[in-house]
Amino acid sequence: MDKFEVFAVSVAELQRASESDGAVPKGWIEQSPLGRVLFKEAASKRSRITESRSDWTEKVTSELSQLLVLPAARYELADLIETDGTKVPGSISVDLLQAGDDRRIPLQELLEQSIPSYDQANDYQVKNVIQTLLDTEVKLPPNYEVPDGIKDGADMFVGILLLDAVVSNEDRHDHNIEIVQRANGELYISPVFDNGSSLGSTETDRNRSQTSPKQYSDEYSISFFDGQSSDITGIEAFKQAAELRPEAARVWLERLASIKPEQIQSIFDRLPDNRITTEAKSFATELLDYNRTQLLKFRRELIVSEQDLTTLYQQYFQNTQSLGLAQVKEIAKAALVEKV
């Protein structure tokens, strides 16, 4: 099986700018085989680059996004060639700018406009994000394919949360979800980007050996979203979104269900051996499999529309008029298992 290509970019062309305010050194390269790209080093400290790194995670998540048909930045593995010939491993992402785009707006800015005295610690909630996207009429990104049934930016946000839940992304804060304002004033949600803190990539092999993927997902994969009474995991954040946008949640879960385990394994098998340790690969694949299993269990329980309930009522309960809707829902969950 062919390994993923590793692109070479020159440090002489690297323009370190305001993008370097994150934890990992990065900078723009205006001309590359893929056009304008953002290079990001594999780790914040080069001494940790063998075990804790984000380059392979960005590539894996980029490939998973394609399988989900979720609009996302294209990521490729890359080496930054220093003036002395030293290779600095990292990743490149293709510039998301499109013709007609005016400016990119951090989600935080929209939330501040919608919520008086917005405070990320308390107000960065799934319900607030969805309501803000709806109130501001944020659309889907142009020139990208999405699954049938995904209609607007709020629906795509549900897909972003699904991706984050699958890969245990712990860094989906209100600055790495962006809204793009077009020259005509329209707003659309940006294709997803910045997935480096996923699949346990920041852990050492020693920590991976001492933590089961289940424990990591259930206890340590805490999202940025506020759960009011307690922190919530990425899976819990997606479930909250599913309550508010059940039709969109069903579409994204169906996409997840359509992905075969061998397709996921193929992505990991194509990573060059010097980009990921054996322990990291094993931990990441088991973590992804656990998260996927948990989400597909939830899919079997999700009743997504009143139309489904009406159909089931007519099919199974037309002679039992005394049943209330709540009772129908409980019985319908079991009846819908094979349907969904």
Regions from the PLM with identified roles:
Residues K59-L67, D155-L163, E286, T293:
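A broad, structural surface signal
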Residues S54, E58, M156, E170-H173, ...:
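Active-site-proximal structural scaffolding
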Residues I29, F39, Y75, S93, ...:
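Generic structural hydrophobic/aromatic packing signal, biased to beta-strands
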Residues R53, Q66, R182-V340:
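C-terminal catalytic region of ATP-dependent kinase domains
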Residues M1-D119:
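Conserved ATP-binding subdomain of kinase catalytic cores across diverse folds
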Residues Q113-P141:
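Active-site-proximal helix-loop-helix substrate-binding element of RNase H-like nuclease domains
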Residues Q131-T204:
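Conserved kinase catalytic-core segment
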Residues Y75-T83, H173-A183, V304:
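Short alpha-helical "patches" and their helix-cap loops
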